[in-house]
């Protein structure tokens, strides 16, 4: 499968996406389903299409994605990051535009750990004065 495909790995929170692109008609398949079916919300589809719209390749590539882990938004972000890396693998001249838009940088925000003696990461137990 790797023959004439360009590859990119994308990550966001706990989601990991493996993205393969090749010249084609613009079909995007995520985990064996069309992108419209996999991402039910419009925001998820919009996030996935951003790097393609920016570079003007919305209907130039067939894209196969395998994504796992995390939730819907994290997976959409991981797919966007993977598509960006695959586009750079295809044509390095696209990197400045994608970098300017902030798609190349991996979003490093992760869930903060729960601390001992707290209810959540920062939420303390209720204080009773008396």
Swiss-Prot record:
InterPro entries on file: Ribosomal_Su5_D2-typ_SF, Ribosomal_uS9, Ribosomal_uS9_bac/plastid, Ribosomal_uS9_CS, Ribsml_uS5_D2-typ_fold_subgr
Query: What top-level branch of life does the organism fall under?
Result: Bacteria
Q: Give one Pfam family, short name only.
A: Ribosomal_S9
Tell me, which GO biological process terms does this entry list? translation
Q: Which GO terms describe its molecular function?
A: RNA binding; structural constituent of ribosome
Q: Which SUPFAM superfamilies match?
A: Ribosomal protein S5 domain 2-like
Family membership, please give it: Belongs to the universal ribosomal protein uS9 family.
> What name does this protein carry?
Small ribosomal subunit protein uS9
Origin organism of this chain? Bordetella pertussis (strain Tohama I / ATCC BAA-589 / NCTC 13251)
């Amino acid at each position: 499968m790797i023959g004439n495909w360009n590859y990119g790995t994308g990550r966001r929170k706990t989601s990991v996406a493996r993205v393969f692109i090749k010249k084609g008609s613009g079909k995007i398949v995520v985990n064996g389903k069309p992108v419209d079916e996999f991402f039910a919300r419009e925001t998820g589809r919009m996030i996935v299409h951003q790097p393609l719209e920016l570079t003007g390749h919305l209907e130039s590539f067939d894209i196969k994605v395998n994504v796992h882990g995390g939730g819907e938004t994290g997976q959409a972000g991981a797919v966007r990051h993977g598509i960006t890396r695959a586009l750079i693998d295809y044509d390095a001249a696209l990197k400045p535009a994608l970098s300017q838009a902030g798609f190349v940088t991996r979003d490093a925000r992760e869930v903060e750990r729960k601390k001992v003696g707290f209810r959540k990461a920062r939420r303390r137990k209720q204080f009773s004065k008396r």
